A protein has these predicted regions:
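A solvent-exposed interaction/effector surface
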Residues: 2-161
Length: 161
């Protein structure tokens, strides 16, 4: 996308339903709650490490800042994308059970637009892009960190599978 001064690399990806286990919080928990969740998740990662999906080199395949509306229907955050649930999580085997203190989410399959996070205004620019291209956000946006290179992405669901 090139509009104004921002250029975004947008990739269309189909991802089947998948499972994550992490530390759950909500926007009702106040400022800084996401950083606190990641701190807890990182500190206690060993508790879920045996269930984490890994690539052929033994590297976890992904860490998700998974999001949902309060009903856990995986709809976009409410009140102009400012209120909802967040799970600081790792992708795990579908059969994994969440240890005590952890939460398991099964995220539905979607066609996503994946965007590399290279500036703080990626989210509003993508919402604008969706509107300009007559695309509908059909689920909650998720943050994703690729453990191989530490790159952050945002995943915007545009079609439910």
């Amino acid at each position: 996308m090139e509009k104004g001064r921002l250029i975004m690399q947008i990739e269309k990806i189909t991802k089947q339903a998948f499972t994550v286990v992490g530390r759950q919080g909500s926007t009702k928990d106040g400022d800084g709650f996401i950083a606190r969740l990641w701190g807890e998740a990182n500190e206690h990662f060993g508790e879920i490490a045996p269930f984490v999906k890994k690539d052929e080199n033994g590297t976890p395949i992904g860490f998700w800042g998974a999001m949902s509306d309060f009903s856990l229907s995986f709809r976009p955050w409410e009140n102009v994308f400012s209120e909802g649930l967040y799970l600081a999580s790792a992708e795990v085997e579908d059969t994994a059970e969440a240890p005590e203190g952890w939460t398991k989410w099964q995220i539905p399959g979607y066609v996503y637009l994946r965007v590399k996070v290279e500036s703080p205004d990626v989210f509003p620019k993508m919402i604008e892009y969706l509107a300009e291209n007559e695309l509908e956000l059909v689920g909650a946006v998720h943050d994703f960190t690729d453990p191989k290179d530490g790159q952050n992405y945002m995943w915007f669901p545009i079609e439910k599978l």
